[in-house]
A protein has these predicted regions:
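Membrane-embedded and interfacial regions of multi-pass energy-transducing membrane proteins
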Residues: 1-248
C-alpha cells in the first residue's frame, strides 16, 4: 500500500505537469521533491517527467499491483478455494516477500541518488540502460545501476511466488477438486503463474547482462560503433567496449 501511494503521488505530479505545464508545482506536490530536479520557476522539466514515468510504471506494476493482487490476495484466497491448509512452500513464500522488500528498498533508494533515478524507461530499454549515467565517477552509485539491481530482486520475488502458486494448485487440491471444478480465480492465478515463468526469466537475464555491461566491461547490449551523449558535450564519441550488436 505504501508503494501504491508513492506511485499515485508520481502520477499526480505528471498529471499536473500535463495540465499546467507553464505553472510551478503547488506546495503539497513539491514538498517531497529535490529542488534541483525542478526548473528555476519550480516547473516539471522534460527530464523529470521522463524519470517519473519510469518510476511510476515500475512502482505500480512490480511494487504495487503484482505483490498486492497476485501475491498477498492470492496467498489468502487460493488455499481457501482449493481446500489446502497452506501454500505448498511457506519458506519459499517468505523468501519471495523478503526479496520483494529488499528490491523495493533498493529501487526506492535510487530516487534520491545525486545522479537521478533510471533514465532508460521502466523496462530498461537497451542500449540506453547500458549507457545512461556513464559520466558519473562511480557507476555502482548511480540511479540506473540501483534500478537494475532492484529489478533483478523484484523479478526473483515474482518467480519464487509463481513456482509456489503453480505447485500449490497442482498438488494441494482437496479430494474431488478436479480441474473442471477449479474456481475461476484459481485458474487465473495458475495461468498468471505460468505467464510469469515464461516472461520474467528473459527480463531478469537481460537486467543482469546490462549490469555486466555497466560494471564489468561486457558488451552484450552495446552495438559496434555506438555513440552516446555525455554530460557537458554534444557527442561523447564511441564507447571503449563494443560488441557485435546482439546478445543472441
Amino acid at each position: 500500500l505504501l508503494f501504491l501511494f508513492i506511485g499515485f503521488y508520481l502520477m499526480m505530479v505528471m498529471r499536473w505537469s500535463i495540465a499546467s505545464p507553464d505553472k510551478p508545482l503547488p506546495g503539497f506536490l513539491a514538498a517531497f521533491l529535490n529542488e534541483a530536479w525542478l526548473s528555476e520557476e519550480g516547473r516539471v522539466t522534460g527530464d523529470l517527467y521522463n524519470m517519473f514515468g519510469a518510476m511510476h510504471g515500475t512502482i505500480m506494476v512490480f511494487l504495487g499491483i503484482v505483490p498486492l493482487a497476485f501475491g498477498a490476495f492470492g496467498n489468502f484466497v487460493t488455499p481457501l478455494q482449493i481446500g489446502a491448509p497452506d501454500m505448498a512452500f511457506p519458506r519459499l513464500n517468505m523468501a519471495s516477500y523478503w526479496s520483494y522488500l529488499l528490491g523495493g528498498i533498493v529501487m526506492f533508494a535510487s530516487f534520491f541518488i545525486p545522479s537521478g533515478a533510471a533514465e532508460a524507461g521502466w523496462t530498461m530499454y537497451s542500449p540506453i540502460a547500458t549507457t545512461a549515467q556513464l559520466d558519473e565517477p562511480n557507476l555502482w552509485y548511480t540511479g540506473q545501476t540501483f534500478w537494475l539491481l532492484g529489478m533483478v530482486l523484484l523479478i526473483t520475488s515474482s518467480l519464487l511466488g509463481a513456482v509456489n502458486f503453480i505447485t500449490t494448485i497442482i498438488n494441494l487440491r482437496c479430494r474431488g477438486m478436479t480441474w473442471m471444478r477449479l474456481p475461476f480465480f484459481v485458474w487465473a492465478m495458475l495461468v498468471t503463474g505460468f505467464l510469469l515463468l515464461l516472461a520474467f526469466p528473459p527480463l531478469e537475464v537481460a537486467a543482469i547482462m546490462q549490469l555486466m555491461d555497466r560494471l564489468a566491461g561486457a558488451s552484450f547490449f552495446i552495438p559496434t560503433g555506438l555513440n552516446f551523449t555525455g554530460a557537458g558535450s554534444v557527442d561523447a564519441g564511441l564507447l571503449d567496449v563494443s560488441g557485435a550488436g546482439s546478445p543472441l
